[in-house]
């Protein structure tokens, strides 16, 4: 029983990171219809921004959360305004453009701070462990899990309970009709892209103390994030949360009997088999029709 509890808790840690990354990806696609191939690079930018703020400016992790979000959200906003805005409804062009943006961001990091690995330590006040279901669990991992849940709830409230969310849903349902009622679809798209990239950056900031920081670190997470979004239903927020849990827990248990590489491969196979049965994903409620 202790083994299963331990692996379940480990799976929740994976779930937390996947949820934040995939949530941003799902929001961007669900609203704009853009498959953002550079999404992993925003995870990387978040990690490097956290490293810079903590090691160069002396800011703590908690204090750096808002600056990390704002800096990366501003980048996402500008990219949408300057590049993505001119490519809507051109699927292959947006895929190629966002892939190119990702490559450029990686090279900019290599040129500015180098390719060597960077490391961050877990804040001392979160480095201790606490007892949970009879297991010793890192306070930092518990914090990440609670923060991910808070971000998901915040995103849901914004989309379904605010005036901006009403405009967002109107634009995704029928852009032309929404424009007739005075909704600025361009502003909605820009804000959505900024919010989605900002969330991805926060995931990178939180994963930085757990893993090494490198220019290509985002590649390791974007594949899993795409699996989460597709499995849950490409345009379903609830599906994104549920599939994050499913993939996180499945990866944890498989890795305990083998290794991370085999676990990722088997999870991919399982995802493909599920999609053969339910091509639209496990959940069908949509942001975008």
Where are these regions (language model features)?
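Membrane-interfacial amphipathic/re-entrant helices at transmembrane-helix boundaries
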Residues: 1-20, 49, 61-64, 90-95, ...
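Inter-helical junctions in multi-pass inner-membrane proteins, predominant
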Residues: 2-11, 158-163, 189-229, 235, ...
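Single transmembrane alpha-helix segments in multi-pass membrane proteins
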Residues: 4-54, 82-93, 231-234
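Helix-loop-helix "hairpin" substructures at the membrane interface of multi-pass membrane proteins
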Residues: 14, 136-213, 237-242
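Hydrophobic alpha-helical transmembrane segments of polytopic membrane proteins
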Residues: 24, 72, 224-248, 269-275
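Pore- or pathway-lining transmembrane helices of multi-pass membrane proteins that form conduits
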Residues: 42-45, 52, 85-110, 218-230, ...
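Alpha-helical transmembrane segments within multi-pass membrane transporters and channels
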Residues: 58-102, 108, 155, 242-247, ...
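Transmembrane helix-bundle core of multi-pass membrane transporters
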Residues: 86, 90-161, 187-191, 253, ...
């Amino acid at each position: 029983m202790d083994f299963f509890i331990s692996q379940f808790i480990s799976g929740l840690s994976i779930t937390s990171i996947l949820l934040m990354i995939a949530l941003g990806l799902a929001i961007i696609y669900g609203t704009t219809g853009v498959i953002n191939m550079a999404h992993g690079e925003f995870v990387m930018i978040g990690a490097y921004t956290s490293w810079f703020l903590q090691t160069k400016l002396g800011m703590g992790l908690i204090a750096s959360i808002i600056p990390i979000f704002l800096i990366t959200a501003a980048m996402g906003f500008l990219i949408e305004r300057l590049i993505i805005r001119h490519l809507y409804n051109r699927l292959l062009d947006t895929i190629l453009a966002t892939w190119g943006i990702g490559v450029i961001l990686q090279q900019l990091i290599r040129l500015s701070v180098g390719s060597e690995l960077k490391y961050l330590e877990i804040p001392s006040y979160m480095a201790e462990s606490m007892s949970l279901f009879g297991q010793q669990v890192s306070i930092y991992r518990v914090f990440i899990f609670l923060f991910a849940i808070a971000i998901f709830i915040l995103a849901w409230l914004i989309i379904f309970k605010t005036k901006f969310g009403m405009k967002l849903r109107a634009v995704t349902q029928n852009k032309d009709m929404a424009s007739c009622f005075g909704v600025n679809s361009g502003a909605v798209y820009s804000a959505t892209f900024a919010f989605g990239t900002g969330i991805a950056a926060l995931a990178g900031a939180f994963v930085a103390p757990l893993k090494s920081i490198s220019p290509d670190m985002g590649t390791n997470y974007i594949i899993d994030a795409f699996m989460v979004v597709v499995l849950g239903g490409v345009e379903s927020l609830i599906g994104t949360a549920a599939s994050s849990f499913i993939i996180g827990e499945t990866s944890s248990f498989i890795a305990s009997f083998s290794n991370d590489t085999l676990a990722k491969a088997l999870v991919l196979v399982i995802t493909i088999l599920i999609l053969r049965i339910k091509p639209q994903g496990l959940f069908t409620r949509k942001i975008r029709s």
